[in-house]
């Protein structure tokens, strides 16, 4: 187990219930969204850090070209959803913690209602509508058909490579209709056989939702397509780790598909861990897929913590 998981409420209890002389652990993703890495640092302080440049120099990992692919779609529906989301969020002072507590904690809900001169019933109704709007907006972003279209375009241009896709849902992964899909609905033996067969292949496509984000070593992967963006640097590092296994002469490619001018841009900004090349048109994407150089541009991101939602 990578040690970043030891900061959870369940696993962190082991620090006080297990007798040990010293702890030695390793992770590529110490930082957590909830800030609980301080627990790990307390019991197992960081004694050494290996930089990416050091790993590349020692040929422990392969270089990766990171592409941010901006998808331009009709945002009429998104703007309507975003307007609803913001109207409900304003009721909770644009504070995620307040909104979630109002939804889940009746004592907090009663207290907050009293503070703002409302009723617990009204506060709960606003919180429920806020959550509904949040999920609707996220669904628009995550499951937009443009992502499937562009994903297929990339896969069709890399038929001679071993590719992996990171999808928001199993249903989304299956709708790509390229290669094979791993998911919890299949028997463990079926998923294992699929990975074994893929390891022995020279090219192909492996689709998954979260099953392959971490803890899996798959041979020969050199192309990744990420379509399940959130604000977590852990997820970004783990998915990149799937394709950067060292092989002589290999340069891997990671394509991150993002709906332009939406909250997904901010999620990408919060989760990004490396330099990237911006692809803001299908013409530029075609050039990249033909191994041509393109001119990239810079984007100013707002990486405020509250923008992770």
Stretches with model-predicted labels:
Residues 162-166, 171-216, 235:
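Conserved helicase ATPase core of P-loop NTP-dependent helicases/translocases
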Residues 5-7, 32-33, 215, 233, ...:
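Catalytic P-loop NTPase motifs of RecA-like helicase/translocase cores
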Residues 46-161:
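Conserved interdomain linker/interface between the two RecA-like ATPase lobes of SF2 helicase motors
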Residues 1-4, 211-212, 228-230, 243:
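Conserved Walker B
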Residues 4-66:
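Post-DEXD/H (motif II) to motif III coupling segment of the RecA-like Helicase ATP-binding lobe
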Residues 22, 204-205, 223:
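Short, Asp-centered acidic motifs that coordinate Mg2+ and/or phosphate
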């Amino acid at each position: 187990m990578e040690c970043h998981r030891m900061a959870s409420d369940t696993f962190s209890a082991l620090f006080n219930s297990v007798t040990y002389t010293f702890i030695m652990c390793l992770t590529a993703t110490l930082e957590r969204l909830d800030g609980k890495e301080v627990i790990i640092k307390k019991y197992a302080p960081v004694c050494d850090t290996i930089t990416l440049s050091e790993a590349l120099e020692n040929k422990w990992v392969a270089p990766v070209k990171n592409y941010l692919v901006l998808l331009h779609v009709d945002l009429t529906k998104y703007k309507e959803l975003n307007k609803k989301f913001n109207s409900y969020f304003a009721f909770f002072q644009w504070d995620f913690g307040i909104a979630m507590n109002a939804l889940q904690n009746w004592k907090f809900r009663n207290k907050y209602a009293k503070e703002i001169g409302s009723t617990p019933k009204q506060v709960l109704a606003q919180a429920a509508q806020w959550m509904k709007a949040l999920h609707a907006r996220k669904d628009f972003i995550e499951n937009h058909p443009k992502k499937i279209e562009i994903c297929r375009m990339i896969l069709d241009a890399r038929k001679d490579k071993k590719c992996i896709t990171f999808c928001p849902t199993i249903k989304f992964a299956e709708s790509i209709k390229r290669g094979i899909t791993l998911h919890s609905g299949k028997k463990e033996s079926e998923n294992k056989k699929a990975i074994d067969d893929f390891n022995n292949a020279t090219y192909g496509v492996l689709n998954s939702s979260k099953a392959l984000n971490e803890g899996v070593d798959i041979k020969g992967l050199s192309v990744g397509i990420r379509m399940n963006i959130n604000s977590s640097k852990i997820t970004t590092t783990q998915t990149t780790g799937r394709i950067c296994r060292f092989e002589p002469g290999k340069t891997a490619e990671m394509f991150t598909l993002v709906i332009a001018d939406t909250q997904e841009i901010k999620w990408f900004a919060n989760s990004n861990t490396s330099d990237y090349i911006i692809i803001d048109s299908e013409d530029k994407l075609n050039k990249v897929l033909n191994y041509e150089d393109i001119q990239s541009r810079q984007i100013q991101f707002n990486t405020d913590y509250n923008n992770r939602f």
